[in-house]
Amino acid sequence: MTVYNFAAGPATLPDPVIKQIQEELPSLQGSGMSILEISHRSQMFDKIIDTAKQDIKDLMHVPDNYHILFFQGGGTGQFAAVPMNLATKHKRIALLDSGHWATRAGDEAANLGVTVDVLDSTKDKHYQELPHMPHAISASDYDYLHITTNNTIEGTAYHTLPEHGDVTLVGDLSSNFMAEEYQVSDFGLIFGGVQKNLGPAGVTVVIVRDDLVNHVDHIPSILNYELFVKKNSMFNTPPVFAIYATGLVLKWLKQQGGIAGIEALNKKKSALLYDFLDQSTLFHNDIKKTDRSLTNIPFKTTDPVLDKQVIAEADQAGLKNLKGHRSVGGLRASLYNAMPLAGVQALVDFLYNFEKQHKNNTMGKRYVSSKNI
């Protein structure tokens, strides 16, 4: 039985990458040493990290005035790092509240003494559509505007970025990093954990414009952008294996036609599932169609008990980790870059058959009930 992993992260990795890791694990490049034990100060790792940076630059067309950095601590770590490094002039930021992770980013900035102005929120609409800019803003008021480009839990995404005037735009791209195309130059800073689209858990990519990298007092060294630029992301021991594995995924991504190629596939995958859900009489997705995510698709029936049955039976069929986030319930299918089209087709086939069987069972019960009247 083929197993497909629909987890929100850590997520599925490309089969060729897993195979290469297996082959190289005992002895990396014939060195007699595993990637798990090589020194981060070795020439071998210098090549690994520099190649990964160059491949990110190539894939995302990163301009020369941006730095590519590797951190630990996930996107959550950057919720603290970004305001510490960037909110230094006004100590005030703007935020569009599109869901759980945007809220977490705002809370962390506020915890650090930064004033957070939530310009718009769709919380009252259960985050089933995106918030938008209610008015123009200025860099004379704000250090930056924070957005979450893809909302992993709620299933929405900014396919077109909000207008932000001369205010620096900070994007949390954690769950659609390299899953669809964005212009890096539209942002002052991009960050994202790689464990959804680009690699295993353990490394966070930060892409930051050079003019935003400044000396800041009273900031932990482990979150200091200036220090990480100077040390080529090796102020301390970096996550060697995670960077190595991410590098392999980047090579694989180039072979898929780059981000444009993988975005086309992601659109095809998501359309396959959305088309089924829109025609279904049992399952439904309540997200505004123009705001739907390519990578995270929540859906449910009208009965939480039935949702649990779907999840359990899907698991038995090899369709793993479809349980929705605890804050919204239901089911969620995460269709990250390495999820093959065949996996989505298998899910749709399963849901179709489940719905058909459910209808038959329901009609049978009604028939028996009517005979007893």
Swiss-Prot record:
Gene Ontology cellular component list: cytoplasm
Any single biological process term in GO: L-serine biosynthetic process
InterPro entries: Aminotrans_V_dom, Pser_aminoTfrase, PyrdxlP-dep_Trfase, PyrdxlP-dep_Trfase_major, PyrdxlP-dep_Trfase_small
Cofactor binding, note field: Binds 1 pyridoxal phosphate per subunit.
Localization per record: Cytoplasm
EC number: 2.6.1.52
Binding site for pyridoxal 5'-phosphate: 75-76, 101, 152, 172, 195, 236-237
Catalytic activity: O-phospho-L-serine + 2-oxoglutarate = 3-phosphooxypyruvate + L-glutamate; 4-(phosphooxy)-L-threonine + 2-oxoglutarate = (R)-3-hydroxy-2-oxo-4-phosphooxybutanoate + L-glutamate
Molecular function per GO: O-phospho-L-serine:2-oxoglutarate aminotransferase activity; pyridoxal phosphate binding
Annotated residues for binding of L-glutamate: 41
Modified residues (N6-(pyridoxal phosphate)lysine): 196
Biological function: Catalyzes the reversible conversion of 3-phosphohydroxypyruvate to phosphoserine and of 3-hydroxy-2-oxo-4-phosphonooxybutanoate to phosphohydroxythreonine.
Protein name: Phosphoserine aminotransferase
Organism lineage string: Bacteria, Bacillati, Bacillota, Bacilli, Lactobacillales
